């Protein structure tokens, strides 16, 4: 007999968690044992830690944490998440309810998509009833300690390839692409080294923005001496996009839209702060270039869109997303799907909506990316977050940020703030569009809700009214018992 998922198409883990109950009401743990219940809740919190630190939204993490606890018989749990903390609460016992709480601190953001895919498969296995708690705990221990699916050198090459592809995306030739490749390689290698030494992310972004600027100005001066023509703005913008790609703007807007304003505000402020570090680093690089008399050329006005290099830009868009996925340690199936999604999104952007302006075009194209990527991710059982973030990476406004910073430092304040505002609006449009597209894909592929175990949830709730009614019933039984014994006498 064909299953519902086979008839309708494959669904994502979070869709299955929202729609389907655990396979059986028989709990694999002793629900009256405080330690076993707390162990299951701690297991669910650790899974939520990996989801949150990988960039999963607040609401989706709650659903999947609750799915894990329900699969082990804890149908009544409250899950509260605020940015870097997870709190889970439940009651155990029959007549005497005993509260159980688990509090877990979430680690910092770590874009390791291989762990996200592994924990996604673990949740599916738990929800299907195929993994008991002790096996799930062992798998989770191995997952937390195991390295990525491939080493850091491969990821570093992915980031470097992404920088070169973004340069082509911005209209640069092979010389510009090669310099952007080397610049991105240097940025990620340096910031990763500083991160291991404990330097805060803000200062890492300052260093990254500085590295993105100074080599471009030196390369421009050398190119003039040899009679070559390059645009340093394309090199700098590609470095900015590499730094912007790992930020959490998409997740912050998704949290705000789905009803988690505290987490959304914190993530949005964090994104603005880290973006400010990039801008500060670019500004330092521009000023140092002037001090060293390695002058950058005046900014040209933004060129009107044309079809002369559309094919190259579409290909570069797909390569950018695939390279970003490699840089985030995604599995190869995820890399391929992310590249195909960005390829279709770039084609849609440059062939149909580029003339609508940067903000509107970004919003429409991101919606198409979120929708297409959401369907493909569900078809191939990949977390939709990976495809969504990678799919909009080619459209990040690195060039607008550089234009704004350059104009501001050259006494063109109005033009500078205008470009910064356009960059912020474009980034917000990308995030909002991809969230909307993924929501549409979820609505099309989501199975109907089915929850036959509501009575279990009701049974675990403590009610003063029920307690009072039980006491009244006990008191009514006592005199009847005494009277019956009196008649026997």
Curated annotation (Swiss-Prot):
This is Threonine/serine exporter. It is a multi-pass membrane protein. It comes from Corynebacterium glutamicum. Disruption phenotype: Mutant shows increased threonine peptide sensitivity. Mutant still exports L-threonine, but at a reduced rate. Keywords: Amino-acid transport, Cell membrane, Membrane, Transmembrane, Transmembrane helix, Transport. Residues 464-489 are annotated as: Disordered. The chain crosses the membrane at residues 151-171, 174-194, 206-226, 233-253, 268-288, 314-334, 335-355, 356-376, 381-401, 420-440. It catalyses: L-threonine(in) + H(+)(out) = L-threonine(out) + H(+)(in). One of its GO terms (cellular component) is plasma membrane. Transport is inhibited by the proton ionophore carbonyl cyanide m-chlorophenylhydrazone (CCCP). InterPro entries: ThrE-like_N, ThrE_2, ThrE_Dicarb/AminoAcid_Exp. Its main location: membrane. It is found in: Cell membrane. GO terms for biological process: amino acid transport; succinate transport. Residues 473-489 have a biased composition (Basic residues). It holds the Pfam family ThrE_2. Belongs to the ThrE exporter (TC 2.A.79) family. One of its GO terms (molecular function) is transmembrane transporter activity.
